[in-house]
Amino acid sequence: MTLKVELVAADRKVWSGDASRVVAKTTDGDIGILSGHAPLLGVLVEGEVRISGEGSDVVATVDGGFLSVDHDRVTIVAETARVGAESGR
C-alpha cells in the first residue's frame, strides 16, 4: 500500500505523488506516517519533512503548518515550503 501525498504552500502546490513513508516534525515531536495510519491532524514546526518513495526521497523545508492524515492520504500545508535545491540543500 502507498500513501498519496500532497505538499502545498500558501501560494502554490509544491509536490504531490505516492510515498511509502512521511516523516515530519510536529509540536509533539517527530512523527512517521505509514500506510494504514490512524487519522491525524498535527501542527508542524519549522524543519524538514521527508517523503520517502520507491528509490528516492523528497526533502522539503517548511516553516510550520499542518499535517493531515486520512485514509492513506497525507496533506501537508505550510505558509512556505521549499524542496531540494530550493531549500538550500
List each language-model region with its residue ranges.
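Compact, glycine-rich, soluble single-domain proteins
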Residues: 2-89
